[in-house]
Amino acid sequence: MKIALSCPASLPATQFGGIMFLCLDIAKESSKLGHDVTIFTTDLDFANNPKTFNKKLPRIEKIQNFLINRSHVWFSIQLFFVNPGMYFQMNKQNFDVIHTIGIRSFQSLVAAFIAKKKKIPLVISDQGGLTTHPDLTSSLTKK
């Protein structure tokens, strides 16, 4: 089965946390079962802050038995990273299923558009909570 995974960050941005680790775990385990897996993500490098993007990271990188396909972020609004190149990368390929992780992201929107356009099943996994994110103000929960 050819599987596309979509998430806002991947290696080397390990500080990004849960979404990235969940995506990597799914990629590792699925590829061990013989599936053809590609992670579509940004070029977030994280280098001590969540706004460091690195155009020098390989656009396509093979790690273990899966691929990481990165595209450059044009701009970001807090942790909402806009990388339109991901749409074109995903649109060029055909997948049996698309799995997006972290639904409050540009990458999930792209995955949903591609799935709808190409009539590919879409799996959505959320990770984290809207009111627990450290970058959001506490005014969301104040009464």
Please tell me what each predicted stretch does:
Residues 8, 101, 126-129:
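Histidine-centered beta-alpha loop that forms part of the nucleotide-sugar donor binding/catalytic region
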Residues 1-55, 64, 120:
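N-terminal subdomain of nucleotide-sugar transferases
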Residues 54-56, 60-100, 105-113, 117, ...:
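An amphipathic, basic-hydrophobic alpha-helix
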Residues 4, 97-99, 125:
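Structural motif
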Residues 13, 47-49, 78, 107, ...:
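Generic structural signal for helix capping and beta-alpha/helix-loop junctions
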Residues 18, 51, 110-113, 137:
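Short amphipathic alpha-helical segments
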Residues 40-42, 71, 125:
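Generic beta-sheet signal
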